[in-house]
A protein has these predicted regions:
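Non-catalytic, C-terminal membrane-associated alpha-helical segments of glycosyltransferases
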Residues: 232-240, 252-305
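Conserved donor NDP-sugar-binding/catalytic core segment of glycosyltransferases
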Residues: 93-129
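Short, flexible, basic/aromatic active-site loop/helix in glycosyltransferases
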Residues: 134-166
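Short, acidic, metal-binding catalytic loop of nucleotide-sugar glycosyltransferases
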Residues: 22-33
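Short aromatic/hydrophobic "clamp" motif used to bind/position activated sugar donors
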Residues: 85
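A short, conserved alpha-helix in the catalytic core of glycosyltransferases
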Residues: 161, 167-186, 190-217
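Glycine-rich, basic loop-to-helix element that forms the pyrophosphate-binding segment
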Residues: 62-80
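A conserved acidic beta->alpha catalytic loop
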Residues: 23, 40-49, 65, 95
Length: 305
């Protein structure tokens, strides 16, 4: 009987995912029966060969193209044998036996549907590991890089030993029962971003609590897969925000958000075009925002696209 299925989506982060899996093996005790499922989104950095060589016991699903995080997670969950799922980013690192802590917590607290640990950076700064549901105001402040004015952000430094009931936790380390995942038909594959927020919101409507557990921690290097492809990252973030609002907010708020994102993308295209001769990163970001503008004009924010 498998207790936990750990599902990791990989895209060209060989140097991180190898360390991640090694840390899982090092810190997870023999008393917990687990399996590791890696869903590879057509990495070209030798990730699959490295994983097959170092960890022949793990399961690797090899996609012929990059199908995104959300669909890859669902793909891994479909073959998972564990009673629980631990959805884990490849750029995370175990520092202790977090597996037992999270597993035992859900076993003891059946009213809680999803739990996540504290995520820290390599210099031990506490990262934002949970959120409040986005409002129109908080979303506008976020997309215009005015988060310092945002009262809707979490209290990142909550560091008590007991758990904190929150709206949503980070999909970077997302622990839940497989039955709950199945009951909600997995992550919404219309969303390439904010899938964790959407899932938590749907779970809460069924009466499940969402918990942040600060007494166990993982290192999270943040966004190492997304940095590999700015075009996909930029468009997914902005279009998924619109899709989330279409799912959970009224039409007037949706139209306000779409207008604000249009303005943002046009301004970003203009100044990144000016800066692009000076840096390859600026050039990649310019292409990302230009691609996003084309997708907006084609209304690729509709649900089902």
């Amino acid at each position: 009987m498998i207790d936990i299925s750990i599902i990791i989506v990989n895209y060209n982060v060989k140097e991180y995912i190898v360390d991640c899996i090694q840390s899982i093996i090092r810190w997870t005790p023999e008393t917990i029966q687990y399996e590791i499922i890696v869903v590879d989104n057509n990495s070209q950095d030798g990730s699959v060969n490295a994983l097959e060589t170092k960890f022949p016991e793990i399961t690797i699903l090899k996609n012929k193209n990059n199908i995104g995080f959300t669909r890859a997670i669902n793909q891994g969950a479909n073959i998972a044998n564990g009673a629980y799922l631990f959805l884990l980013n490849p750029d995370t690192l175990f520092l202790e036996d977090s597996m037992t802590t999270l597993y035992s917590f859900l076993e003891r607290n059946r009213h809680v549907g999803i739990v996540g640990p504290k995520l820290i950076s390599t210099d031990e700064n506490i990262q934002q590991s949970y959120w409040k549901y986005p409002t129109l105001i908080s979303s506008l402040l976020s997309i215009y890089h005015l988060d310092f004015l945002n009262n809707n952000k979490n209290h990142a430094h909550y560091d008590k030993s007991n758990y904190l009931s929150v709206d949503a936790i980070s999909g970077g380390a997302f622990f839940l029962a497989k039955n709950l995942f199945n009951d909600l038909n997995g992550f919404n594959d219309n969303l390439f971003w904010m899938e964790d927020m959407d899932f938590c919101k749907r779970a809460s409507t069924l009466g499940h609590k969402i918990a942040y557990l600060p007494n166990t921690k993982l290192i999270h290097y943040i966004g190492k897969s997304s940095e590999k492809n700015w075009v996909v990252t930029i468009s997914n973030r902005l279009l998924s925000k619109i899709k989330y609002f279409k799912l959970h907010h009224g039409s007037s708020e949706v139209m306000t958000l779409i207008t604000a994102i249009y303005l943002l993308v046009v301004v970003k295209c203009a100044y990144l075009l000016f800066l692009s001769p000076f840096s390859s990163v600026y050039r990649k970001k310019f292409i990302g925002y230009l691609t996003t503008l084309k997708l907006l004009l084609n209304k690729q924010y509709q649900i089902g696209l």
